[in-house]
Amino acid sequence: DVCSSDLAGDFAKTVLMPGDPLRAKYIAETYLENPRQVNAVRNMFGYTGTYKGKEISVMGGGMGMPSIGIYSYELFNFYDVDQVIRIGSAGAFQDNIKLMDVVIGMGACTDSNYAYQYGLPGTFAPIADYELLNRAVETAKRQGTNVVVGNVLSSDVFYNAMSNVNDLWR
């Protein structure tokens, strides 16, 4: 596995996962109290510390579904993690979404065949846990953050060969 088996128990039940491992390091050093590094395999840095008294981990997930798929699978299945929350940057199809807006995914769509590997027919579109979604939205609103809730799209392709693909997904 990509994480060291010596680290079982070192991850919190909740793991925040930006794509960039250096962003994970920045988050740990800036926001966590007493952060300790729990992973450096393949330079996919992971840290555990506390935030406002709650134990939390942050670890890079890499670029694309195959990368985060491997890391999240191992966190859930080998390290007893309960929640993985993807954080970080993304593109947008809607013109009303601005830089620094917080987008909270209510449902997740894909043009990938990733779900097929798990015996799921078609393109399974998981939806968010309502309680977690509602807490995130209410917290963002209380803090005066511009928040947009809706479906998100993940793709295996970063630079698509179809020039009109963005228009088709709108």
Model-derived segments and their meaning:
Residues 40-170:
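Glycine-rich phosphate- or other oxyanion-binding loops that anchor nucleotides, phosphorylated ligands
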Residues 2-4:
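Short, small-residue-biased leader/transition segments that mark boundaries at the very start
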Residues 6-40, 50-52:
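N-terminal low-complexity or amphipathic/hydrophobic leaders
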